[in-house]
Amino acid sequence: MNTMIKILLIALAGLCACIAAQSAEPRAFGWKPDVGGVVDKAFGPRFRGATIKESVDLRAKMPPVYDQGAIGSCVSQGVGVALDYAHVKSNPGLKFFTPSRLFIYFQGRVAIGTVNQDSGCQIRDAIAATQKLGAPLESLWPYRESKFKAKPPTAAYSDALKRQIIQAYKAETLDDVKRALSLDLPVVFGVPVYRSIMDLSWFNYTLPMPAKNERSVGGHAMVVVGYRNSDSMLIVRNSWSSNWGRSGHMLMPFEYWNKFQRQTDAWVISVAE
């Protein structure tokens, strides 16, 4: 066996081991469907004049992909990265700061009285809390899964006020999502997901449509960071680390979005201090 074949076999073995380890990692969800509230500014009427581009890809402009681990903090991961992105976009010259996702997750559960449970939360509650309280630096309340029940320290609350969401809008249609992305604004959304989402990899990172009579395994919040009209795909960022999917991302068919549009809960954070 020549040297090149040996190298290829070793690389293939390493890839298989990586895929096996990836599939064995715990996966958590945590999105609670929207039940209505006071944070309701519709995106469509305010930005109807925005031109929808043929394609958009914001991946290179976003902070590194987060990892929620084994707790249901997906909403705080999505709102956190959207806040970080909007903060930098609204303040040219600043760098990404990485908000405390554990802080956002705690405040999102305060609204529903479940701070002692790993209950997940609604996107609107996490946004409303971040409008009121802001989000501190990750270093002031680090992401330690075992600490999800603990109230953040006073210093975290003081620092959080430096970074607040100023404007957030509800995106109600796929065209709303495309218009937001055409304005370089990512979209945080929650949707029912199925077992197949846990099996995506570098080589297979397109989310399949659920089979007939297949049951959802939960609700999950993610972030749309692009789309392609050419093959009717959304580019979606997850919070299961960069080892999942293709560097932490997947492709979601427009068909999937349209199928669940009435259940999908989507938000655009356009301005942050």
Describe the residue ranges of each PLM region:
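A short glycine/serine-rich beta->alpha loop
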Residues: A60-I71, I112-V115
